[in-house]
UniProtKB/Swiss-Prot annotation:
Disruption phenotype: No visible phenotype. A motif (Nuclear localization signal) lies at residues 222-227. The keyword Nucleus applies. InterPro entries: NAP-like_sf (IPR037231), NAP_family (IPR002164). It comes from Arabidopsis thaliana. The modification Cysteine methyl ester is found at residue 376. This is Nucleosome assembly protein 1;2. May modulate chromatin structure by regulation of nucleosome assembly/disassembly. May function in nucleotide excision repair (NER). Involved in somatic homologous recombination. Residues 26-80 form a coiled coil. Residues 347-360 have a biased composition (Basic residues).
Length: 379
């Protein structure tokens, strides 16, 4: 229980502090670890010498494991970097086909035979490829509104790359020229305190240069002036609204974290975790398996995983139901036994003679005491 509490405090600390100097944040974490180490040393002192000796030996084993794990993380990072380079030619081919830069052999001829030459000249690549892929994923679909779809039709590619100092990763969204904003590339960068055990330090996004009247993250409300008002023009008010493009304006912790109360800090932490979920989903799922999300195959695979989890839960419930049924049967058997014993007691009363009433009564009393139901005996 205490370990869970300690890990929760560490997570709160990492998301609540937002020092301009990253070293200051790391020092704060070190101080927290030192305090925890002091608490753990108190635990060791309270142990008996033999148990303390065993625990110290277990800690040595843990240190050996930690060294191996650190080496694993190092080798894994190198392996991922190696394969990330090998993936690039495949990503390039995908980009060229999706955007009609190159044509798949035989595709143009099939279109000509089915729809005519004029149609084949208009339709190139795979229209709305990234929009459909994003809409088919449950996490990213929740962020996309109908107003966003027009702009996301111009999305040509999504890439991700590692960031070394500080550790993290960057997402790049490449857009064709469009009537919504001037930017051709929108980026989102996640800076991590610990890349292997993801603790988010901060996230940064591109400032979108919206064309006049095209901002998708805000909506303009027009209200009629009150009757009798000198101003006859409608009152306009700008209000923030839901949009996928809010993703590029991530939640930020104020410079002075003392301004945050507990409720505000919890809400902000939830927003940052949700923002990271979106980014990691795009990085780990959408980019690497884009065509599967476009076709819906990835959705089916996700559904199968969910169904497997549900089946496990159902099996557990069935086992519990079976145990409950067995318990009910045992209770019914006990009740039947008690009724039989009671009937036998009544019969013995009738058969006993008047001369033996006292003896019968004493025996009956003893019988009643000795034949109490199991639950009474336990009391």
């Amino acid at each position: 229980m205490s370990n869970d509490k300690d890990s929760m405090n560490m997570s709160d600390l990492s998301t609540a502090l937002n020092e301009e100097d990253r070293a200051g944040l790391v020092n704060a974490l070190k101080n927290k670890l030192q305090n925890l180490a002091g608490q753990h040393s108190d635990v060791l002192e309270n142990l008996t010498p033999p148990v303390r000796k065993r625990v110290e030996f277990l800690r040595e084993i843990q240190n050996q494991y930690d060294e191996m794990e650190a080496k694993f993380f190092e080798e894994r990072a190198a392996l991922e970097a190696k394969y990330q380079k090998l993936y690039q030619p495949l990503y390039t081919k995908r980009y060229e086909i999706v955007n009609g830069v190159v044509e798949v052999e035989g595709a143009a001829e099939e279109v000509k035979s089915e729809q005519g030459e004029d149609k084949s000249a208009e339709e190139k690549g795979v229209p709305d490829f990234w929009l459909i892929a994003l809409k088919n994923n449950e996490i990213t679909a929740e962020e996309i509104t109908e107003r966003d779809e027009g702009a996301l039709k111009y999305l040509k590619d999504i890439k991700w790359s590692r960031v070394e100092e500080p550790k993290g990763f960057k997402l790049e969204f490449f857009f064709d020229q469009n009537p919504y904003f001037k930017n051709t590339v929108l980026t989102k960068t996640y800076h991590m305190i610990d890349e292997d055990e993801p603790i988010l330090e901060k996230a940064l996004g591109t400032e979108i240069e919206w064309y006049p009247g095209k901002c998708l993250t805000q909506k303009i409300l027009k209200k009629k002036p009150k009757k009798g008002s000198k101003n006859t023009k409608p009152i306009t008010k700008t209000e923030d609204c839901e949009s996928f493009f809010n993703f590029f304006s991530p939640p930020q912790v104020p410079d002075d974290d003392e301004d945050l109360d507990d409720d505000m800090a919890d809400e902000l932490q939830g927003q940052m975790e949700h923002d990271y979920d979106i980014g990691s989903t795009i990085k780990e799922k959408i980019i690497s398996h884009a065509v599967s999300w476009f076709t819906g195959e990835a959705v089916e695979a996700d559904d199968l995983d969910i169904e497997d989890d549900d089946d496990e839960i159902d099996e557990d419930d069935d086992e519990e139901d079976e145990e409950d049924d067995e318990d009910d049967e045992e209770e019914d058997d006990e009740d039947d036994d008690e009724e039989e014993e009671a009937d036998q007691g009544k019969k013995s009363k009738k058969k006993s003679s008047a001369g033996h009433k006292k003896a019968g009564r004493s025996q009956l009393a003893e019988g009643q005491a000795g034949e109490r139901p199991p639950e009474c005996k336990q009391q």
